[in-house]
């Protein structure tokens, strides 16, 4: 199972979600912002893109670009994400984008743990976005194995050896004349996250037991029995009663909307034969 998606930020400008859907895109991961918890570091189109995705019925995830050089900065980045996510439901998870050259030599294992743990503590599904070289290098730690991975490798195949859920395979996916980062997701994230949050899919229809069905049919017949004979059939009903061809129900009534059963037809034919 591979699900087609894109990731977007303010750098993509105004995104037409109908065009995305018409080109087979089924999910989008939206940048929240970058760095520590300052409003001037919010992505200027985050709220707009979330609103558009939800209006289009497209599940979305979110990511924050990291500049954290220590766990204190990572905590601020987590606060940044949580502020922007308040009241929202990212069904494709929350991702920590670790790729900036300034992070060379930083303990990115510790900063990634800090951010992802804060997301999970808040009830979100957390993962790490990074290039193949970062994942095989500075981020290659068993401490991070419990977090999902979103692998950036612009190639014909993903060669990351550990488990991952999303592969960003290109930065040149052209849709509607615009360039996007193209992604394949290999997990049903909406189902996973709904289950994590205790949500279940409700059945549209419930099966009736035999007793429930029987009770329903009896009440249905009772209501139908209250209906009067249609005016166009009144003469015919009076005739068959007078001639003894049909007697109706036990109380002499006729159910105008009911089907004639085989046993009722047999009674009519017998009455005619006996004459």
Explain the meaning of each model-derived region.
Residues 1-116, 120-125:
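Substrate-binding cleft of extracellular glycoside hydrolase catalytic domains
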Residues 73, 134-144:
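Glycine-rich, charge-decorated loop segments at or immediately adjacent to ligand/cofactor-binding or catalytic sites
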Residues 101-103, 133-136, 155-159, 171-174, ...:
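Short Gly/Pro-enriched loop/turn and capping motifs at secondary-structure junctions
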Residues 123-136:
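Aromatic-lined carbohydrate-recognition surfaces of secreted/lumenal glycan-active proteins
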């Amino acid at each position: 199972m591979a699900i087609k998606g894109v990731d977007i930020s303010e750098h993509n400008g105004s995104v037409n979600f109908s065009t995305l859907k018409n080109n087979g895109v089924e999910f989008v991961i939206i940048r929240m912002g970058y760095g520590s918890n300052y409003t001037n570091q919010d992505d200027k189109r985050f709220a707009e893109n979330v609103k558009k995705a939800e209006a289009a019925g497209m599940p979305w995830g979110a990511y924050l670009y990291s500049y954290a050089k220590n766990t204190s900065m990572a905590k601020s980045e987590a606060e940044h994400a949580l502020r922007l996510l308040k009241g929202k439901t990212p069904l494709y998870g929350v991702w920590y984008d670790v790729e900036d050259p300034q992070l060379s030599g930083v303990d990115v294992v510790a900063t990634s743990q800090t951010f992802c743990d804060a997301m999970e503590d808040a009830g979100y599904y957390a993962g790490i976005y990074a290039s193949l070289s970062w994942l095989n290098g500075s981020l290659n730690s068993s401490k991070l194995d419990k977090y999902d991975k979103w692998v950036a490798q612009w190639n014909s195949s993903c060669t990351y050896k550990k488990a991952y859920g999303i592969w960003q395979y290109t930065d040149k996916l052209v849709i509607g004349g615009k360039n996007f980062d193209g992604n394949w997701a290999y997990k049903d994230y909406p189902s996973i996250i709904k289950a994590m949050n205790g949500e279940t899919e409700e059945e549209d229809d419930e099966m009736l037991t035999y007793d429930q069905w029987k009770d329903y049919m009896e009440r249905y017949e009772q209501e139908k029995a209250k209906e009067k004979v249609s005016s166009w059939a009144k003469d015919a009903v009076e005739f068959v009663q007078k001639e003894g061809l049909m007697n109706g129900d036990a109380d002499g009534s006729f159910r105008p909307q009911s089907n004639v059963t085989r046993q009722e037809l047999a009674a009519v034919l017998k009455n005619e034969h006996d004459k």
